[in-house]
Curated annotation (Swiss-Prot):
EC top class, as a word: hydrolase
Quaternary structure, from the entry: Homodimer.
Listed InterPro entries: GTP_cyclohydro_II, RibA, RibA-like_sf
Protein name as it appears in the record: GTP cyclohydrolase-2
Binding site for GTP: R49, V50, H51, S52, E53, Q70, E92, G93, R94, T114, T149, K154
GO BP term, example: riboflavin biosynthetic process
GO annotation, cellular component aspect: cytosol
Active site location: D126 (proton acceptor), R128 (nucleophile)
Cofactor remark from the record: Binds 1 zinc ion per subunit.
Underlying gene: ribA
């Protein structure tokens, strides 16, 4: 286990009241959060989203990505379902950090795509460690999920880490003229499954 569960509190939101559960990485002290809605106990697979931190999309309403749109849509789907989990994975910018993400944006402004920009900065296309999320699910007592994602790699990594992904639920929202090239690159170079938007 790479994490420990350290704190929890109620979190009222426009979608209803969630239980916010805080986790701490044992090796680094970095924190991550789960939002739990309804009763997630029992054998029925839980609707879940692993959402990687994106300050620009989630809090600053950036149109460069689909992250903020996905966050809102995931919370809506979970609330409509009546039960579910959103893991807020604190690995900003596909885990290159906020300042390097800004540097990557500057390279994208010069014509590089999102993958090329990461490579120019000396990073892989995606530096995230999703095995932490498998530990969060386990600490919440969940071993089977219906995962809201367009990223088959995320499904593969969580499955290898012992989480039973019984269904991949597409979450295709937020495409606009400012992020179309970014989304096309994620599909072409990173294998994301992006069809028509909702």
């Amino acid at each position: 286990m790479q994490l420990k569960r350290v704190a929890e509190a109620k979190l009222p939101t426009p979608w209803g009241d969630f239980l916010m559960v805080g986790f701490e990485e044992l090796a680094t002290g970095h924190d991550h959060v789960a939002l739990v809605f309804g009763d997630i106990s029992g054998q029925t697979p839980v609707l879940a989203r692993v959402h990687s931190e994106c300050l620009t999309g989630d809090a600053l309403f950036s149109l460069r990505c689909d992250c903020g749109f996905q966050l809102e849509a995931a919370l809506t789907h979970i609330a409509e379902e009546g039960r579910g989990i959103l893991l807020y994975h604190r690995q900003e910018g596909r885990n290159i950090g906020l300042l390097n993400k800004i540097r990557a944006y500057a390279l994208q402004d010069q014509g590089y795509d999102t993958v090329e920009a990461n490579h120019q900065l000396g990073f892989a296309a995606d530096e995230r460690d999703f095995t932490l999320c498998a530990d969060m699910f386990k600490l919440l007592g969940v071993d089977a999920v219906r995962l809201l994602t367009n990223n088959p790699k995320k499904v593969e990594i969580l499955t290898e880490a012992g989480i039973n992904i019984v269904e991949r639920v597409p979450l295709i929202v937020g495409r606009n003229p400012k992020n179309a090239h970014y989304l096309d690159t994620k599909a072409a170079k990173m294998g994301h499954l992006l069809g028509k938007t909702e």
